[in-house]
Amino acid sequence: MSSENMDITENIQNEQNKDFDDIDFERRRRLLTLQISKSMNEVVNLMSALNKNLESINGVGKEFENVASLWKEFQNSVLQKKDREMLDAP
């Protein structure tokens, strides 16, 4: 085979390899993009579930505000009574 034919053959092979590399790159990029998209959707779903749980916890906490207020008033009255008794004691 002449040197010129070898150069042409080598150039063709290089072009084919480049095309295969480009195709492989595009395929891998698409796969990575799909994986990222899937992962982001999963993150959004998990964040939504977390938000619902936090809202539920906040709602439960608000239900106990009246009870907590009542116990606080009771504690304050008991402490005030003790303070008065200590002041009145000889």
UniProtKB/Swiss-Prot annotation:
It is found in: Nucleus; Cytoplasm, Cytoskeleton, Spindle; Chromosome, Centromere, Kinetochore; Cytoplasm, Cytoskeleton. Belongs to the DASH complex DAD1 family. InterPro entries: DASH_Dad1 (IPR013958). PANTHER family: DASH COMPLEX SUBUNIT DAD1. Component of the DASH complex that connects microtubules with kinetochores and couples microtubule depolymerisation to chromosome movement; it is involved in retrieving kinetochores to the spindle poles before their re-orientation on the spindle in early mitosis and allows microtubule depolymerization to pull chromosomes apart and resist detachment during anaphase. This is DASH complex subunit dad1. Pfam families: DASH_Dad1 (PF08649). The keyword Cytoplasm applies. One of its GO terms (cellular component) is outer kinetochore. Keywords: Cell cycle, Cell division, Centromere, Chromosome, Chromosome partition, Cytoplasm, Cytoskeleton, Kinetochore, Microtubule, Mitosis, Nucleus. Component of the DASH complex consisting of ask1, dad1, dad2, dad3, dad4, dam1, duo1, dad5, spc19 and spc34, with a stoichiometry of one copy of each subunit per complex. Multiple DASH complexes oligomerize to form a ring that encircles spindle microtubules and organizes the rod-like NDC80 complexes of the outer kinetochore. DASH complex oligomerization strengthens microtubule attachments. On cytoplasmic microtubules, DASH complexes appear to form patches instead of rings. Interacts with sim4. The keyword Cytoplasm applies. Transmembrane segments: none annotated. Its main location: nucleus. It comes from the Eukaryota. One of its GO terms (biological process) is spindle attachment to meiosis I kinetochore.
